Amino acid sequence: AADQATDTPTNNFCTLNPIFVGNQSTPPSDGATYMSDNGTNQDVSYAGTMGVTKGKWYYETYIDMRSTSYGLTIYVGYHTFKNNYRANAYWSSTNQDSVALYGMHTGQYWTWNGGSRSVTSGLGDIGASGVGKYVGIALNLDDNQITFYYDGNAITNGSNLALNNLGTDTDAGIFAIPAISVYDNNHTVNFGGYTKAPISSAQSDENGYGTFEHAPPTGYYALCTKNLAELG
């Protein structure tokens, strides 16, 4: 039988957009939550179906595996896709769109600041022990900050990071959209609706929406139509 999401007629959750995929990549599967790139040796970029310009939002991703050749070459965060939504790599030095991305294998945070790429090093990176764990992304557009989590805890030096250009964009009404880029890895996203990732704790946001492995931080909400109508 086909996979089915836990949406209802009155509440739909964000998924990965199958027509919003860069670099000849395979469209997401399993309810548009699973990214299959292992063995391709190329950058594969994905984007969500919902965007936000204000409020506080949470989603998480599940580390299905780790490339034996390249490690966890996975970036997660947000993008505004102002110009080139089919960019092969969201972190490309030629891509002037605004990003806020955490690189799992490098422990780096990437944004654009003015006309230059800004790289913040010293965040915790994730090694082989990360397989089977979750990375959380908490976007705070009220204060133009982002925090990244690993296995339920804030990543070292990964709290309240400035959004730089992305925050400027959302202040101007340009939508920030969930963005994930992988290289030679398979990866699963959980926006709170259907996901193939294993959920053992079934945590929801403060409005009672979403099913997450780790509870969203206080004041952060799942990307779904009910929450967007009230908060986004």
Tell where the protein language model's regions lie, with residue ranges.
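PRY/SPRY (B30.2) beta-sandwich protein-interaction domains
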Residues: A1-G232
